[in-house]
Curated annotation (Swiss-Prot):
Xref: SMART domains: RL11
Main function: Forms part of the ribosomal stalk which helps the ribosome interact with GTP-bound translation factors.
PROSITE patterns, sorted: RIBOSOMAL_L11
Name of the protein: Large ribosomal subunit protein uL11
Xref: HAMAP family: Ribosomal_uL11
Entries under InterPro entries matching the protein: Ribosomal_uL11, Ribosomal_uL11_bac-typ, Ribosomal_uL11_C, Ribosomal_uL11_C_sf, Ribosomal_uL11_CS, Ribosomal_uL11_N, Ribosomal_uL11_N_sf
Annotated Gene Ontology cellular component terms: cytosolic large ribosomal subunit
Length: 144
């Protein structure tokens, strides 16, 4: 018989820097999960990733206090900022533009994010990422 799932915990944790302090400690502690076991496993799995890169993680908590977790790709916003070397998006995205991104850069980001997106094909994924870029005040070139 399969284990009984008691809940899911969604967090964004910097790669290789999971520790028991908030937000990880309280979120896992409420479910009675072993916080240090998660931190060690997460840090071990994210060794090859750029340190400090925020990674979404979905933790599945079971009734017997065990857990499993799935690490997703970094948020599109983070990848866009990294691609065009930007610190933060525009406070007024539709009037003040903060940078430009090309279709080639968008395709690279879309390929990296493809498994986490619901897009049917690469072109749809590029349009999705382009929408995220526009909403943070980045001018998108080559995408209608």
């Amino acid at each position: 018989m399969a284990k009984k799932i008691v809940g899911f915990v969604k967090l964004q944790v910097p790669a290789g820097k999971a520790n028991p302090s908030p937000p990880i400690g309280p979120a896992l502690g409420q479910r009675g999960l072993n916080i240090m076991e998660f931190c060690k496993a997460f840090n071990a799995q994210t060794q090859g990733v750029e340190p400090g890169l925020p990674l979404p993680v979905v933790i599945t908590a079971y009734a017997d206090k065990s857990f499993t977790f799935i690490i997703k790709t970094p948020p599109a916003i983070t990848l866009i900022k990294k691609a065009i070397k930007l610190d933060k998006g525009s406070a007024t995205p539709h009037s003040a533009k903060v940078g430009k991104i090309t279709r080639a850069q968008l395709e690279e980001i879309a390929k990296a994010k493809m498994k986490d997106l619901t897009a049917a094909d690469l072109d749809a994924a590029v349009r999705t990422i382009a929408g995220s870029a526009r909403s943070m005040g980045v001018t998108v070139e080559g995408v209608v």
